[in-house]
UniProtKB/Swiss-Prot annotation:
Complex formation: Homodimer.
EC numbers for this chain: 4.1.1.23
Protein name, per record: Orotidine 5'-phosphate decarboxylase
Lineage: Bacteria, Pseudomonadati, Pseudomonadota, Gammaproteobacteria, Pasteurellales
Active site location: 61
Amino acid sequence: MDNKIIVALDYETEYEALSFVDQVDPSLCRVKVGKEMFTTLGTNFVKQLHERKFDVFLDLKYHDIPNTVARAVRSAADLGVWMVDLHASGGLTMMEEAKKILEPYGKDAPLLIAVTVLTSMEDLDLLQIGINASPMEQVIRLAHLAQRAGLDGVVCSPQEVEVLRTHCGKDFKLVTPGIRPEGSDVGDQRRIMTPKQAIETGSDYLVIGRPITQAQDPLSVLKSINASIR
């Protein structure tokens, strides 16, 4: 079964993170390791997650010159992660070289996903960095660029999924943060949606953090979310 839930492991210590993953079942979710945890704990932490049979989304959002990003993506593949991402705004050549370096890995290559517009950003935020376009317009532009580069999909807000399905087709993976079960705190992400709404709209994978990781009974919450999207 293709797990649609990716749990964001946003903890300050290895003990807290491993205590959480030991409470849940790798058949019910995948896990995401971001910049903070990877910078603190490194590759050994990812290996410990693999030992527990979890698929890992390495969410480091690479953005650098093409050669540097390609080598970083290769290192992620050598680590055995399931998914890795980079910033589409790094350009076509950067994305093409990152995809090309994965060719020798064949079916064992991680999914290579592009970040389009961060879910915390709105029109004014884009304007302040010199982009005179709405988040939706910029997402479409960057998604087309990522698809042209041969990437597997993009990270986008749930509200952009339906439009991207039209523009990029059914096989282009759509990974959606900004997912909050009903009754959850919105936090710092402005463009949000419930798991059920996101799947019905066409999301492939849902990134969910605090509603699961800060729950008194995370396994029950995870089971409930999975039940809601079946």
